[in-house]
């Protein structure tokens, strides 16, 4: 039944379902569709159901969209700490990277959900171990925050994310380590500070 339901079906995330799938693949597809539906309901006025429980045999680090984002990327971006916690307890990696090298923490700062919910401090508590990672363009989480400042409507959100990260990392990192990350250039040689100044 599951096979016929998803056979040759264009998935909502832009990924084509293979014509023939194993039961585990069908199970993964069904769960990820339900999970993304759950996330989408958070932006609507409809009553929010409980998030779908991942099947025991599912690979939680497998991408769920055509950009290579995993369930952890989505949960972090939506500011859903319950799902983040559930995924972590079930063995999902906090340092998973999308096709462009983006981490869940980087993904989170690109959206305002953690600002709207005031959840960034608790999210950083879980993801701070990935704060020194770079994507394939050499960009750090601070570059990603700086990139959002091209929209004036996101200034306050970006400042909130920046303050949280600086405070949390400052509590556990030596000052020179934090300074080095802030001064790190991407593949164009631009630091997060330079990008922020460009957008002012």
Model-derived regions: residue spans:
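Fungal intrinsically disordered, low-complexity polar regions
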Residues: 1-57
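Ankyrin repeat domain, specifically the short helix-to-loop turn at the C-terminus of the second helix
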Residues: 52-59, 85-93, 121-131, 163-180
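Conserved small/polar residues in nucleotide/adenosyl-binding loops
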Residues: 198-200
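Ankyrin repeat boundary signal
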Residues: 60-64, 94-97, 131-134, 183-185
